[in-house]
Every structure is written in structure tokens, then in C-alpha cells.
Amino acid sequence: MSSLRPDEARKLATAASVSPLSNCQFCGVVISSIADEQKLEFTNKYKGSCTLLCSYDSQGVVLRVVSDDDRSHVLKEYMIAADTDAAQMGRRSYAVSLDADNLVLRFGSEQDQQLFRKVVENVKHLRPKSVFSQRTEESSASQYFQFYGYLSQQQNMMQDYVRTSTYQRAILGNAVDFQDKIVLDVGAGSGILSFFAVQAGAAKVYAIEASNMAQYAQQLVESNNVQHKISVIPGKIEEIELPEKVDVIISEPMGYMLYNERMLETYLHARKWLKPQGKMYPTHGDLHIAPFSDESLYSEQYNKANFWYQSAFHGVDLTTLHKEGMKEYFRQPIVDTFDIRICMAKSVRHVCDFLNDKEDDLHLISIPLEFHILQTGICHGLAFWFDVEFSGSSQNVWLSTSPTAPLTHWYQVRCLLPMPIFIKQGQTLTGRVLLEANRRQSYDVTIDLHIEGTLISSSNTLDLKNPYFRYTGAPVQAPPGTSTQSPSEQYWTQVDTQGSRNSSSMLNGGLSVNGIGDGMDITHGLMHPH
């Protein structure tokens, strides 16, 4: 699959790293094996001519050999890496050693041979590791791109109505920022944001996607007849080259707690392609942090860890692992949603400016905390959520993951303290949250809290890479003790009031059902008590 026109491919071929030129195909190639190196005798490896499919890979270029007659069946797959031995043979042939095969590739034209030679040379002259590769473990990157290469994962994000509709509204509501402009979509996935940019009048969109989802994005581009507007470029923004600067960068780089997956660094890195005074969509992000009280959640995690406190589990004493089990469970951030009334103080806001902050600023994020406690109770930890703003020329649009806003696939995140602290209304809770980036595309989160004027403090370090997904889909329950009137009496008062109204309607032709009245929904009070 070639996602670039030949002229664009040649422009990108100047990249010092593996460029989008590496995603192309060569038809009518005759492949021979070297049977005798001394006599230079060759034998045809495959019957008839073949097609070579080249595709970008983090290690180089994957070369797939398929028959010209049946491209659905892969005859052989090779990896062209930096240490691959290769040499030109005449004007149309190329010798290459791949795995245990010494091959001669005879191309259908000189141009094809030159283009393939360029593919190999690009791999052999790779730049030093990109910024992304330096900060990311290979296993983590592989898992990450494999995850986002599944259509089901893209569907999960696309079906987040709040997320997708907010992006579309922000882009279409600021069409002046996109009309006849050059746009860069970072981590394009299915390309949905690129399509929104075209809907807003963009002249050209470069959609960068490092996972296998790039091939599906290309299919969508072609089936929607916008290939003249959207160029899908497989690869990482840290490694590819663009033929020009852009007016606008769009992306959806937010993870749990805003920073998880470290995609924000990639988003900031993309600014190297942004023209002066260019736009970023979104423009900045606010991370909100608040202390919370939730005895049920704390007990749930604590009781899980107590599994390891058994001294006779099928005749085996597990207690030696109890301490480690407790530590592991409390190192897990909890991803779910909650009633904001569990928060004991107004949230502290930490701002990330996508237009001006540097990548390095996100390697170690230190957030000072000061909370003025609004209600007496036990603080079990800190709750996190984020908002992002799209600052456009026509209007500003916000996307919120607050517990007071419609639920999104980001939910909210809570980090527990192994040792909760009792705190009174009017006291001040101070401390710090430290987010330390790691090579697993995530953060180690350290929380330190202290009640001002006392010796009471508590701390914990959590692994944001290993969250506990607790959300069940059940309605959020109000915190215990928030009812100021009898819920039973409230409900029956509501029934009496509704019944009285329906009795009045009967005089105008309404019907009575069991003496209650026509059209009355008696479940409403049960489901939504005031």
C-alpha cells in the first residue's frame, strides 16, 4: 500500500531516517536465488514475477513477497535492517542478502530499481535513535502500537460521543483557522480528525500514524475520495519528514490523568513543523487534583490484599507475601467515576501549555498542593481529572473529564493512600504530587500529604502504567450521609403530588390507573430521588 503520490514520496526520500517512501510496492519483479556464487549461477526462486510490498517498521522496512497473480497470499516476508547487505547489479537488478537467502531482484524498470535502492539506503543510513526511541522501551512501544492498530480500539474512542463531537465542534466552529490551511494530524489513528479538518476547508492534511491503523486510515481516505486532501504517512512524528510547514496541528494526545502514555510529548515535538503563530488543537490542558473520602473503595482494595493474609490456603501459609500484596494493590491507580461530593476541598489546577511548554518539562512534573478542607472526614487519597481547551479564532471549546461532566472513555482516576488521614473542616492539607516519566510510556506518581500545623502526614507511590479499571456501568451512588431529608418520605410526597396533578387532568378526560393517574412514571422517584 502506497499512501503517497510518487512526487511526494521523492520529497520525503531525503529523510535521514526510514521515511514514508518505505511504504510502497514494486510489481513485475523476477526473484532469483544465487545457486553458485563462484560461477554466478542463478535459479528462479518463484514461478513467474512477483510484487514486493514494502512497509515501515520500527526496526527498518518489512519486505513482503506476493505473487503478481494472487496478492492475497504472502510467499515470504523479510526484514530490511541497517545491517542488510545489498548492492546494485546493472541498471535494473539489485542483489540483497535477507535472512539465509542471497537474492537477485530484477525490476520491471530502472526507476523501480532506483526507488528500491533508496528504500534500502534509507534503512542503512538510519539516524541515531529518535527522541521517541530514546525515551521508550522497545517492548512498550511494540505493545502500544499493536494496541492502537486494532479497529476495536479505534471504535472505542470514536464511539465516545463527548470526545468525538467536541473535537468536531471545535474544528468546524473555528473554520477560519482551517480554511485553505495546511494541517498536521499527530497520531491520526482512523483519521477522523483529519476528516473534520477537511470538512472545515483544509487545503491539505498530513495524517501521521505509526501503528498498522495507517492502512485502514488510507482505505477510509480513498473510499471517501479525499486522497487529494489527506495524505496518510505511516511512521512516528519524531522520525518522519514533511515536505512543508503546517498552519495547524490537531491531535488527541491525552491519556488517563492527562499525561499517561506520554503522547503529549509527541504532540509538543510536532511543533517543529508548526509555522510561527500557528494553532494547536487542543491548546492547553488542565489537570485537576482534589482530596477525597471513600471508605468503600479503600476497603475494597484493602480486602483484596488480605487474600495474602491466609495462613492455611489449601494447606499453604501465604502470609509472607501479605506486605507485598498490600503494596501492589495500593500502587494501582483506580480508573472509574464518582460523585464529586466525595471531594473534600476545591481542586488544585495544574496547567500544561501545549503552545509553549517543552518536551523536557513533561519528564518530571512537580505539582504543589494546598487544600482548604470543606468537610470533616477521612482522606483516602487524591482524585484526578482533566479539561482541555481548544482556543480558536472564532470560539473557545472545552472538553472536560470532570465528574460533573458527561462521562468519557477517560473516566476519572483516584490514587489511594495506604494510611488514610483524618482531617477536619477548616484545616489546610498541603503537599506535592510528583509525576516522574518512565520508559514504559507512563509515569510513577508520588503523593505526599501533610496536615498543616500537625505531625500527621501520609504518602504513596503508584504505577500509572498498571491501573485498576473499576468502572462497571452502574449509576454513580451519592456519598453516604448526603441525604438531609427522609428519602422515603420524599418519594411518597412526590407520588402524592403527582397523583394530585393527575386527578386534575382526569377532569379533562384523563384516565386513572389504580387510583394514581394516567401517564405517571412512579419509577422516576425511585431512580432519581431528590
From Swiss-Prot:
S-adenosyl-L-methionine binds at residues 154, 163, 187, 209, 238, 266. The keyword Hydrolase does not apply. The dimethylated protein is the major form. GO terms for biological process: chromatin remodeling; peptidyl-arginine methylation, to asymmetrical-dimethyl arginine; positive regulation of ecdysone receptor signaling pathway; positive regulation of transcription by RNA polymerase II; regulation of DNA-templated transcription. Its EC number is 2.1.1.319. Keywords: Chromatin regulator, Cytoplasm, Methylation, Methyltransferase, Nucleus, S-adenosyl-L-methionine, Transcription, Transcription regulation, Transferase. Belongs to the class I-like SAM-binding methyltransferase superfamily. Protein arginine N-methyltransferase family. Methylates (mono- and asymmetric dimethylation) the guanidino nitrogens of arginyl residues in proteins. May methylate histone H3 at 'Arg-17' and activate transcription via chromatin remodeling. This is Histone-arginine methyltransferase CARMER. The gene is Art4.
